[in-house]
Structures are given as C-alpha cells and as structure tokens.
Amino acid sequence: MLPHIGYFFNRRLLIVCSIWALPALALAQQVAVKVEGDYPQLQDNAEAFIGEVEDRSANSLRRYAGTAESQVEDALRALGYYSPVIQWEIIEPSGEKEGPARLVLTVQPGEPVRVRSRKVEIEGPASEDPDFGSSLPPTPAEGDVLNHGQYSSLRQTIRNRASRLGYFDGEFTSRKLEVDPEKRVADITLIYRSGERYRLGEVSFTEGHGFEEELLEKFVRFEPGETFHADKIARLNTDLSNSGYFSGVDVDASPGSAEDGVIPVSVGLTTRPPRSVAAGVGFSTDVGPRLRGNWREHWINPMGHSRGVETELSAPRQNLSTWYELPLDPPMTDSIRLSAGYQREEIEDVESELLTFGQQWKHQLDNGWQQVASLRWEGERFRIGADETEQSALLLPGLGYSKLQADSPLDPSRGYRIQFDVTGSHRAALSSVDIAHLNFLVKGLYTLAGNHRFLTRFQFGGVATNRFSDVPPSLRFFAGGDQSVRGYGYETLSPRDDKDVAVGGRFLMIGSAEYQYQFADNWRVAAFVDEGNAIDDLADPLATGAGLGIRWISPVGPLRLDIAKGLDPEFGGEWRVHFSMGPEL
C-alpha cells in the first residue's frame, strides 16, 4: 500500500510553512543547516523549524542530531520535498580555536512532490453565489510543487468566506490531501456543502441612548430579510461610531440567535459626553503663528442636532464662526448647516472685514461625489491700498461638487481630490454687483515602487462681473505662498495698479509637480516646480518657482519644510522658506 498523508498533517509544520516568505531567523551558533542548491524557502523553513539550540556539549549534540534531522524533514515536507538526503556532522574546536561544538546538517532536497489533481467544489446555494466562488486562491494548482501552507490557506478561505457571507451551516463533506511520496504526486479534494444562506432580521437598539429611534434607523443601510453579509454589520458599526454621538458601539448579529435562518441584530450604544473643547497652536510661513480653538456640542436633542463655535487667530487674519447642523437621511453624509461668521484680514495692501450668514445642504451622490448647495449673504467692508473704504453686500447662491479618493486619511500613498465650485450674485437679488465666480481644483498622488511619490496639482479660477472694482477682495484671486506658488510671498502674485498695489485678479491659474523620495521611516525629500499667477487676462505671463524640501510624517500628518527660489524677479521671486502641515490631498 502506498503511504498517504491526510489533511490532519502536523499542525506545527503547517504554521511554520506559512512563514516561508519571512527573512531567515537568526540561529544559535551550535546548529547550522545547509540546503544545497538555490532553495531559500527551504533554508528559511528548516532554520525556523529547528529554532535555537545552545549550551550543548558535543555528545549532547550527537544525541540531538536525530531530532534535528526529523525536524528538517518535517520542514521540507511542508514545502513539498518528501525525499531529502540529510547528512550531519559534529564539528568540535581544535588546537587554538575556541567555542562550542557545532552540529551541521547538509541537506539535498531531492525531487519535490507535485499536485497531480485538484478538485474544489462548492455544493448547495453557495454554488450559485458569485461572491462565494469567485477569486478562490488558485494555488496549489495542478503541476505546482505541493505547499501545505497554500492548501491550508485554500481550506481556510472557503471557511472564512462562508462565515462572511452567512452560510453558517456549511461543512466540508470531503477534505483530503493525499500524498504519494514514491510517485511524488499529491491529490487535493475539497468539497464544501454550504447549506442555506442566513438573512438579517430587525435591528433593535438597547434603551438608554437618548436618541429618537427614527434617527438611529437612518444609520441602517440594509432592510430586514436581506441576505447576511459581514460587511453590512461592519458598516453599521462604523457609521454609528463615526456619527460623533457615541463613545461605544456594539453590534451583535450572532447566528446563534437566529430563528428559521433569520438573525436579529442588536445594537448596544454608549452615549458620549455631549460637549467638547479643543485648542491648538500652529505655524505656517503664510500667516505665521496661529491659534485655533473650537467648542462643540455633539448633540443637543434626541434628533441629533449639533452646534459649535470655531475661531482662528493670526497676525494677518482673525475669524470667529458659529454653526448649527441638522442631520438628514442618511445622516452619515447628508446634513443642513446654518452658519454665521466674522473675519478680519490684512494682507499686503488689502484690508477687509467680512460678515457672513448662510446655509449649506450637503448630499452625497450614489457615485461617491459630495454635492453642496449653498445660499449665503456676505457683507464686506474693504480698502485696497490708499483708496477709500468701500462696502459690498452680496446674496450668493452656490453649487459645489467634490470627491476625495485616498487609501489613507493622513498620509495616503495614492489618490486624488477633485473640487468644483460655482457661485454668483445679481443686483436684482439684494446684491451690489453682478458676479459669476468659478473655482476648480484637482490634486493627484501616485507612489511607485514604495519609495517614489509623484504629486500634481492644478487650480483654475475665474470671476465674471460687470464692474470688477466693486468685487470685494474675498472674491478676487491672489496667488503665492505655501499652498500656491512657492518662492513668492503669500498672496503677492496679483495684478497691480499704478501705485504698485496688489489689487487681485480676474483669473487664477496654478500648476505644480512634485517628486518625493522616502529615504527613511517617516522621512522624505522632495523636489518641486510650481507655476501660476492671479491675472486679468489668460494670456498674461505666469510666475515660476522651484525648490527642494523635506517631509516628516508625524502622527497628525505630514510636516513640510521647503526652500524655494522664485525664478521671476519681476513678480517678486526670491529665495524663500516655506513651512506647512496637513494631508497631501
């Protein structure tokens, strides 16, 4: 009878074979394994299986040699080599050489066992479920060298997928790995009978949370009777956790509580403290030191309304704003926010005081785009250069779309941001000037080979009006600074009047390309070129800046330090240091 080895293969051996791709573990000096030929996986597995051996005499090593030989055999079998030739010898120090005796095992792997046949079948309702059968691990495939770790992974993937999709009564009706070492072949048979797929039942919330059931039900994205999927439960947990209402969320959808294949969903909620206060100090070369603070009441009634106050203080800019927000359906993405704010700003030769009142309706489209419809009133008092102080009053309806795709919120390796906003006013609707205002921004980030990052940025803006001199500074365009064109002062790029005062432009055009190289954990160097300007005519010249920088990836996001040279002295280009922080996208 040919020897066979079943699915119950040594558990320890299967665990070790799963680490074949890890760097080799350092061994004690008293035992060494030498696998002849180019077999780094076998070498690593054998060394890992033996582990550390130390403080042994030569005689002790001789007694241990048989055990070590068996361990190496098991390690090689895990990767499909069942017929190795292993020789060992004891090397003792001689003459003036000092040190302990060493056991050296020399291994000739021999020919491997290959997979002769692979039979993987899903029976029952899961056989018609595309989510179940798709993308099962292709290895070990017919003709491959047998790898017990891959076989174990295939088996576990089927189990995990059944649990994730709700086939909780599933079982293997046949689970065999038959190996014939003499013929050097292996046959794999995995037949899984899924049973019926469970469904989700009603969602209930434990008492004492303080919110209306109608609000909480809006967080549930599935209907009773839908098929079970673990992702639906995880999404409910995440949405409730991110709502800002709760400090603890526990979603229980255990199949043990099911009746007739329907699982009731129970949600336990721990309400967070209703109010929080935060303050912080920051710095950028655009505005210098700044102080930020906010007070927020995360919920003020059972309907989940919230409100807050925010302020930012720096030498050139001071602002104070307050807001009141009402959640819509779904509350994770949709809301109405009422706001009011005051801002005072003095930059270069422009002074302004801005008072705003408005509302925003945020709505996420099915394709992932965020839509913001707004209506705000702005009253601005401003002075440009030595001109007299002027005032404007504008009622500005607006519409904006944005989308952010990134693989990490703080330090993504790839992704993009697209943002488009349009707003306007008309003298027939409580406004002092006719305006159509457009702003478009796109950023892209791509990482190649782990260490090479490429960032691009393009921004375009435009304002159409019957009388540009009546357009307030907050709706004109200025360029230059940390987040604009480096190598030039903050908002110094702009058309100028006959007194050389920057008055702001009708158009904004900015492009940037940056390369980063990661040379150490959390550290990158950068090289960049920026080009752009605030202009009155699209044919007007642009300013160019270039430079080098360094990036430190802090726990709160990247910190950027750049040294840039403005290449156009007629626009005020010079050597400048720029410091800023925040996500790349």
Language-model-detected regions and their locations in the chain:
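Bacterial N-terminal signal peptides that target proteins for export
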Residues: L2-C17
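Cleavable N-terminal signal peptides
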Residues: I15-V16, A26, L240
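N-terminal signal peptide c-region/cleavage motif recognized by signal peptidases
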Residues: A21-P23
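Periplasmic polypeptide-binding modules associated with outer-membrane biogenesis and secretion
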Residues: Q29-P40, G51-T285, N294, G308-L326, ...
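Gram-negative/organellar outer-membrane beta-barrel architecture
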Residues: P125-D131, H229-Q419, Y446, F454, ...
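Extracytoplasmic gating/loop element in the C-terminal half of outer-membrane beta-barrel translocons
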Residues: I263, N451-F528
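One-face residue pattern on beta-strands with alternating periodicity enriched for small/polar residues
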Residues: R290-R292, V372, L396-G400, D421, ...
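Transmembrane beta-barrel strand/turn architecture of Gram-negative outer membrane proteins
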Residues: A340, Q359, R417-H426, V433-N466
